[in-house]
């Protein structure tokens, strides 16, 4: 993590910079680099749901499914109406061969947001 000087250490501004840099790393397909930056942000701001959601996405992209599951679950404890987090948790369960848990969260995502991708994954017809 960047430090502004040896005596002051990380600041809220450097945490914002690290968060934005982590977004860019994830977009550039470097999820492990994103996780490294977000670890410091979350250590300083454990209540930051956006940082946790981004770290969950990075874990998922790095195929670190247990940590992704944990982070998505924490996000959903705080934001139970977050359709994307339900969808992403469902995809995580799907990749772990846990279809019943995946189905539940796919359906919750679709119920919260009628996004065509969520509706297709929910498979309400089955």
Predicted regions and their residues:
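Long, contiguous interaction/recruitment modules in multidomain scaffold/adaptor proteins
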Residues: 1-17
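Structural signature of tandem alpha-helical TPR/SEL1-like repeats
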Residues: 28-36, 62-74, 96-108
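Structural marker of alpha-solenoid helical repeat scaffolds
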Residues: 44, 78, 95, 111-112
